[in-house]
Amino acid sequence: AGALTARLAPEPDPALVRAVNAALILLADHELATSTMAVRVAASTRADLYDALLAGLGVVAGPLHGGASQLAYGLVRDAEQLGPERALDETLRWQHRLPGFGHSVYQGDDPRFTVLKGLVDDLWRPERRRILDTLLALAGQRALPGPNVDLGLGALMRAAGMAEDCGRTLFTIARVAGWTAHYLEELQERPIRYRARAVYATRP
């Protein structure tokens, strides 16, 4: 974590290194996310590890998966520059959804966000901390979905002074460890066990 932080952050300090290390742990694995499934499908065909990891990299590149923290970073940046309420309103107006909020697995807050939020709070000055707290409160008042790990990661990148695309880098580096474990696990299963069927549907 120390070497990675030194390359991504302009002023790496011990608190930031601890936060990045925690993020790497939190992001290493999360059940059968789409990129993890891609790795396991490749492993089921007995592709070698490097090819299976390439399958995961292709999927994680999507803005709704590994790149989602970049959109959340933009929301946090806009909340700082425009104010939380205006940032929320304009994001919903143009994107029709709030990046960094909602997750298919969790009904409420993503517990990974909760951990990252605590670490971000330690890095931010009180006035910047209040901006994120206000954004969260406004989202709650509007009954929007709870915050997810992408918001936590985007906020961490912002607090660290990192570039907005560093979240994707951190996410991918962390997830490679999890993918490798899934790859090895899949090799113990029956080969080519993922075979979906399709039903042809004509127009009425």
Model-derived features with residue positions:
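Hydrophobic alpha-helical bundle cores within soluble ligand-binding/oligomerization subdomains
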Residues: A1-P204
